[in-house]
Structures are given as C-alpha cells and as structure tokens.
Amino acid sequence: MGLDASLAILGWTRMVILVVCFAGAAHLDNKQRKVHNSYWKVWVKSAVLLWVLEIAIRSDDWITYCTMAAVLAYGSTALIGTPTIADLKKGSWVDWAVVVWYGIGMYGIYWGVVEYIPLNDVTAVLSYPTNSNEYMWLQTLMVIPIMFFIKMAWKLRLIHGGADAKALLFVAVLIPSWVTFVPVNGDTFVPPVFALLVWGGLGFFLLPLSLILHNIADNNVKSFDDITMIWHATRMPLDEITDNFVWLLDEVVISPDGEPTIVSSLQPPKKSPTREELMIKIEELRLMDVEDAWVTKKYPLLSYIFPGTILMIFFGDPIWWILYFAGLA
C-alpha cells in the first residue's frame, strides 16, 4: 500500500471518529448540558494513536514525536488541571507524568528549532516540502498556539461551555492538519478545528431570525423594550423556568424613587445562580403579578458543531468558500 493510500485511510478514519464522537457529545450536552471529562479521555486515546501513526508514515522523526508530547501535555491541562508544586509534593503520579511529558516536549521543541529553523533565514520555513521532516515538525508545533487560542477564548467566555472548548481541543489533536484528508468539494485555508468552529457558528446566525419570528408569532412584542429582547430571548411561564436549561433575564430592582420595577437584562449572568437564588428571583417576579418572564436558553454549541462535521467532510473549509466567492481564492 502506498503512502497516499495510507494517509487517505488515516484521514477517513479520523473523520468517522470525529462524527461519532461529536454525535455522542452533542446528545449528552443537549440532555445534560454537560459532557464529563471521562468521555473526552476515552476518545482522545484514539486521536493520539492516529497522530502517532501519521508521524510514523510521514516522517518517523524522533524530534516530532517529542514535540507532540509537549502538545499533549499542554492540552491535557483542560482535563486534569495544571500540575502544582503542592500536587507534586503529594506524589501525584498523574501530575508527575505531565511534568515528564513537558520535559520531553521542550526537548523536542529545542532540537526542532536547532535542526529545522535556519536562523540566518527564518522565512525558509514557509517553503518546506510537505513530505519533509521539517514540515511535519512545524505542523506539530503549530498545534500549541491553536490550543492556546482555544483556551484563551474559553477563559474570556468567547467560548462559554467547558465541553465546547474541550471538544475543540480534541479536534486539534484528532485532525491537526488537512494533510490526511481531502474534502469532497472545495479546498482548505484555515486549520480543521477553526473550519469546524466556523461551520458550527453559521447555525447561530440563523438563531436570531428564528427567535424574532417565534416571538412575533407568540405575541411577545408588547412594548418598545420588548423589541430589544426578541432577537435573543423568549418569554417563559415562571412555573417552567426551574425545569429548563435557561437563564432568567428579568429581575425586580428598586428604582431611585423607592418603587420596585422589573428590569430585563440583555445579557445572561456571568455566573449561573443557584437553584435557591433562582427561586427567590422568581418569587419576587410573582409578587409583581407577572406570569412569565424573559429567558434565554442555554444553547449547547456542540449541537451546532455536530452538523458542521458533515459539512466539513463534503465542503471542507468555509473560509475558503468565502474567499472563493469573493474572488480571492
């Protein structure tokens, strides 16, 4: 079997794993609004194995293997946390293993810089042949900034759910590049994990329009203030709020003249209230003689990303398509 055939089998295996894994994750996230770390720990094993096989097929270079260790150590902190001095003193073998992996990874990165980056002409890295050890090492190294971007987006709440961030980190390991997979249609421009995120994000563009039509049909537009709410929220009976995955946007506040009034927030709270705190807010609204309130649903991003896996298989990178229709690709 030739190299191209081996990579093709590897690529399609990755895509099958991606679809099956995300189908299960989307189901769990939709039902529970939570995907336990144990789920990702099971699936990431297959992703790591396939990555090792890719390196073995393309370069079998010890520097690249070591650099991959740095990527895995950095990504593992999303599942097991960052090792601390206190944990190491307690003799936690998991934390010590991560530290060892970091050491191996730093060793690989150091020798990669020494061997593969000409200091007198750094721009030479842009012209490495795709089948060279240098190119494979550089592709492996570039997964680290991709993971950093995902983690920062998570911390800054650009990616709201932990399961969503861990899913994207999983994709970064499962499909670090497009080398092993050629989409049925279209071409590629950005890394696979970002292409998948864009495909999933397209579903959110249709969400405001859907909510506007839903609120108009339910006659939820009764004042000018309601117009500011209909594109991202819906009204729900107070009795149903605690049994649904929603954020309550209405709140009773005391106005400057000492009178209680209902204020609708345009954003969900930064920290989800406890059930007791939510019940107090609902009771305050009942005392204002209201029967329903504005809420925004906790839409699971994974439910939107999952269809994106199919779109990515058949249409590749959405950014490339945008550039194509703009006449730039």
Q: Residue spans of the language-model regions?
A:
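A membrane-topology feature that recognizes alpha-helical transmembrane segments
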Residues: 1-329
